[in-house]
């Protein structure tokens, strides 16, 4: 099963594609869709087209996107919601089922701790997907979304083959931190 994870943003939308076969997760690609410093409709169109292009290139079976949270600034929340809407429209128009997860669910599924930092997310994504480099925070969050969906949005303790895989490498999660 191929999963496209999306971390929506008006300026930068992260994406990550993974393949899942049983408990095995394989990295396919990741990156960001950057919007030009233009008017809102142009930015939303760029996000929509970027998602549509990813669907044509990678043919995902499923997708996962972060739910909108209420920010301190209501205007920022509205803009984020519009960027998320453009991404969802791209997914739906491409025939890709969409699952939604909160930031808490994402962090619990990937790191095992709901208040994990961006750096902890990046470290765990690198470990779980055996990446040679550290992805940007937006791409790491998108890959994390895909990982979260691959494991039903569950916590690290229910990830089946992932936790034993970390143990074989001498790694574990303690108080939300990856330790060796």
UniProtKB/Swiss-Prot annotation:
EC number, as in UniProt: 3.1.21.10
Primary location: cytoplasm
Gene Ontology BP annotations: DNA recombination; DNA repair
Keyword Metal-binding: yes
SUPFAM superfamilies: Ribonuclease H-like
Residues at which Mg(2+) 2 binds: 66
Annotated GO MF terms: crossover junction DNA endonuclease activity; DNA binding; magnesium ion binding
Keyword 4Fe-4S set for record: no
PROSITE patterns: RUVC
Source taxon at top rank: Bacteria
Function: The RuvA-RuvB-RuvC complex processes Holliday junction (HJ) DNA during genetic recombination and DNA repair. Endonuclease that resolves HJ intermediates. Cleaves cruciform DNA by making single-stranded nicks across the HJ at symmetrical positions within the homologous arms, yielding a 5'-phosphate and a 3'-hydroxyl group; requires a central core of homology in the junction. The consensus cleavage sequence is 5'-(A/T)TT(C/G)-3'. Cleavage occurs on the 3'-side of the TT dinucleotide at the point of strand exchange.
Catalytic activity, reaction form: Endonucleolytic cleavage at a junction such as a reciprocal single-stranded crossover between two homologous DNA duplexes (Holliday junction)
Active site residues according to the UniProt entry: 7, 66, 138
Organism: Paraburkholderia phymatum (strain DSM 17167 / CIP 108236 / LMG 21445 / STM815) (Burkholderia phymatum)
GO cellular component: cytoplasm; Holliday junction resolvase complex
Note describing how the cofactor binds: Binds 2 Mg(2+) ion per subunit.
InterPro entries according to UniProt: RNaseH-like_sf, RNaseH_sf, X-over_junc_endoDNase_Mg_BS, X-over_junc_endoDNase_RuvC
Family recorded in the similarity comment: Belongs to the RuvC family.
Protein name: Crossover junction endodeoxyribonuclease RuvC
Record-listed Mg(2+) 1 binding positions: 7, 138
PANTHER family the UniProt entry points to: CROSSOVER JUNCTION ENDODEOXYRIBONUCLEASE RUVC
Protein's cellular compartments: Cytoplasm
Keywords (A to Z) from UniProt: Cytoplasm, DNA damage, DNA recombination, DNA repair, DNA-binding, Endonuclease, Hydrolase, Magnesium, Metal-binding, Nuclease
Subunit and partners: Homodimer which binds Holliday junction (HJ) DNA. The HJ becomes 2-fold symmetrical on binding to RuvC with unstacked arms; it has a different conformation from HJ DNA in complex with RuvA. In the full resolvosome a probable DNA-RuvA(4)-RuvB(12)-RuvC(2) complex forms which resolves the HJ.
């Amino acid at each position: 099963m191929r999963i496209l994870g999306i971390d929506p943003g008006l300026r930068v939308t992260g994406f990550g594609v993974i393949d899942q076969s049983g408990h095995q997760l394989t990295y396919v690609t990741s990156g960001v869709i950057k919007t030009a410093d233009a008017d809102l409709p142009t930015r939303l169109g760029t996000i929509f087209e970027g998602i549509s292009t990813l669907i044509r290139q990678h043919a995902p079976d499923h997708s996962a996107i972060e739910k909108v949270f209420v920010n301190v600034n209501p205007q920022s929340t509205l803009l984020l919601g519009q960027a998320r809407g453009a991404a969802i429209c791209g997914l739906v128009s491409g025939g890709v089922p969409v699952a939604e997860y909160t930031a808490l669910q994402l962090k619990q599924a990937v790191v095992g701790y709901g208040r994990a930092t961006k750096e902890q997310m990046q470290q765990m994504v690198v470990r779980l997907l055996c990446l040679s480099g550290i992805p940007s925070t937006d791409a790491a969050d998108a890959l994390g979304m895909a990982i979260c969906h691959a494991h039903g949005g569950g916590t690290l303790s229910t990830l089946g083959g992932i936790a034993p895989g970390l143990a074989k490498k001498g790694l574990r999660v303690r108080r939300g931190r990856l330790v060796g």
